[in-house]
Amino acid sequence: MEVLPPLDWEKVGAETWGDVGGQIKQMGIGKVAKGLLLSSIQERTKTWDGIFRPVRQPEWWQGDGEYHGPKYTEPVSELERRLKLGEFVVACEIAPPLSASTNKLNSNIDLVKPYVTAINFTDNASATPRMASWACSKIAIERGAEPVMQIAARDRTRAGLQGEILGAAALGVRNVLCVTGDSPVLAPQPRGRMDINDLDAIQMLWILRRMRDEGRYLDGREVKFPPKFFLGAAASPFASTPKFQALREHKKVNAGAQFFQTNLVYDIERMEIWLNELAKRDILNKVYILVGITPLKNLKMARYMTDVPGVYIPESILKRMEAAEVAGNSQEEGVQIALELARKIKGYEKQGVHGLHIMPVGWEDIVPRIVTEAGLS
C-alpha cells in the first residue's frame, strides 16, 4: 500500500521524487551507485528496497493485504441502509459555494433532495478553495438531506484528519468519502507547496476504519466514543488499464472502503471490463459501487472532458455531440446521452453496480429530469 502511487494522479509528482532523492542522499550516492551497478541481483534488489521502501512504506504504517470488514452490523446512515436492502440508489454531487453565502447551496439541496438518497459535497476540487465539505454536510442535515462528506488527503495531516473526522461525527455526518485529492498543480496562483503530502486515500481509509472499529487513534490511544460512519472512496475505471486499476480499488477495500463512487463513465463496455477485473479479485461482494455520470452541456464541454485524467469519452459520443452542435441542440443531446447511460448502468445491478452518482457540474436543475426519465425515482 504505497504512498502517492502513480495511479493516484496522471503521473508521480515532485513530492514523491523529492523523498526518493532524500533517501538516496541519506544512504550515500556512492553506495547506491555501487549497489545498483556493480553488485549481484540480490544486492541490487536490496539497494532498490533501501531506496524505495522507506518512502512507500513509512514506519507508522501497519496496513496489510487482508480484507477487514466493518465490526458493526446495523447501518449507520440512510445511504448504507438502502444499499444493504438491495435498492438501486441515486446520489448526486453539489459543488460547495465559493463564498460564505449559502443561498444557492440551500436551493440546490432542496432541489435535488426529493430525487436522491445522498448528496456529495466535494472538498476543494481542482485544489481550489471553497466552503468546507463538513460545513455543507451540516447544512444538508439541517435541511433534511443525507450528506456524503468528501475529505481530501492533499490538505490533511495525520493529526488533522483524526480531529476533523471526530468533529464531523459530532455534527451528525455518517457518510465519508476519502480521496487523495486533485494535484495542487491545478490550483490557482499562488499555489501551495507541492512537497507536503502526509497521507493518501488508502492510508486515510485505514486510519478511519481503525478509529471506528478498534476505537484507536493512530498513536494507539483509546477513542472513548468512536465515530460512526459509512466509509467510501473514489474509483476510476479508466485512470489506467483495468487490471492495475482493480488492484488500486482492491487496496482501498482492504483498507476499509465500503462503497465506491466512480469517476465519469461514458463507455459501458470498458466499465464492464473493469467490473470483471474486480470480480477476479473477489471484491464485488465486499463493496457497493455507484457509477458516476455527467450530462454534457455542449461540444466544448465534451472535448474538455477528454483531457481530464481518468475520463474516457468514446468517439461515437463525440460525433453525436458534434452533429448536435451543428443542429443547435447539443444540450438536449447531452441529456439524452446521460439518460441512455443511466439506463444501461442500472442494467448492471446483478454484475456489481448498486447505484448511480450524478455529477451535474453546476447544472443541478437537470438532476430531477435524469432521475425521473431514466426510471430511477
State where each predicted segment sits.
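Active-site pocket-lining/capping segments in soluble small-molecule metabolic enzymes
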Residues: 1-20, 45-52, 67-78, 181, ...
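Conserved N-terminal beta1-alpha1 strand-loop-helix module at the mouth
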Residues: 17, 21, 58-118
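Short, acidic/polar
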Residues: 23, 99-111, 133, 159-165, ...
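Active-site-adjacent beta->alpha loops and helix N-cap segments on the catalytic face
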Residues: 43, 47, 101-102, 127-138, ...
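Active-site mouth loops of central-metabolism enzymes
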Residues: 89-103, 147-159, 229-244, 323-336
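Conserved, mostly hydrophobic/aromatic
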Residues: 93, 119, 168, 252, ...
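Catalytic beta/alpha-barrel core
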Residues: 119-129, 151-152, 178, 259-267, ...
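Glycine-rich anion/phosphate-binding loops
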Residues: 153-171
